[in-house]
Amino acid sequence: MKPILVITLLMLCLFTYSQRITNEFFVFESILSNDSVYNSFEKKANLIKESGFNGIEIFELDQFNEKLNAILKLGFKPSSLYTKLDLDEPELDPRLVDAIKMLKGLGTTICPYIIKKNKVSLHSRDKEVDKIAIHLLRKLSDLADESGLQVAIYPHLNFYVERVDHAASIAKKANKKNLGLSFNLCHWLATTNMDERLELNKQIRTLSPYLKMISINGANNIISSKSNIWGDYILRLGEGNFDVKGLVKYVAIDLGLNIPIGIQCYNLKGNKQLVEKISAQVNELKSF
């Protein structure tokens, strides 16, 4: 019996250490924003596809039709649509309504960032403004549901909704099955102190019923003193001292959330090799 027991234990250990994350990984459109070779959306999308990613973000509604057509022509996926939800406007942008209809059945996550003139200060809330957000998000969620799509509120530094707890509170009150939030590493770092960061896993676990997506990048786990904090909070994947692999493992394996994972690329300098390096880092993240 002992040899059988040993073999069984070895097989269990092998299975444990060979788990592979199967979440969808996609790249934000901001990558290679000033590259002279990949100077069109279609060229960029094709490079990203050839580099092994599952999809690409569509950034905003300008040139939406052209971008979507380019993606579909390549047999690729529009993983997310990053778009504005303006609380000073009484209705949804008609272009967004049309875009969601065109995305029907494509599995795209709609990612609204929420803005409001005369935004309240960080860490504060405005119940009346929240009610406006909830009203518009319910409309957006119903529209997205008709196309089989998920909606993930996108917390963003200096916008009306900039913290994940605020986004979760709004999503909970809106009470739509396809509405939740995106955990964006760079914006989370920009809106938290060191004590809050020690509770990351606890925060993620609390957010998990509402998590529709996460976005990651390399980062330094410090309180940035730079005039441009993104110099610490948005680095190439694989750079910086923040434990990105631990975050991905906790979300995808420990919590078992099979949600899309976006790669933040804002203001990163580089060319084709940048995409290749990020792709290599993603492959490393997938294996445990």
Features from the language model and the residues they span:
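A cross-domain feature marking catalytic cores of carbohydrate-active enzymes
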Residues: 29-32, 58-60, 80-87, 110-116, ...
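Conserved, mostly hydrophobic/aromatic
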Residues: 48, 56, 71, 151, ...
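N-terminal pre-domain/capping segments
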Residues: 18-105, 176, 180, 279-288
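Active-site acidic/histidine proton-transfer and metal-coordination neighborhood
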Residues: 89-181
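Histidine-acidic metal/acid-base catalytic patches
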Residues: 19-29, 39-42, 142, 164-167, ...
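Acidic-and-aromatic substrate-binding clefts and catalytic sites of carbohydrate-active enzymes
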Residues: 32-40, 55-67, 84-95, 120-123, ...
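Short acidic/polar active-site loop segments enriched in Thr and Asp
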Residues: 54, 77, 108-109, 212, ...
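Sec-dependent N-terminal signal peptides
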Residues: 4-13
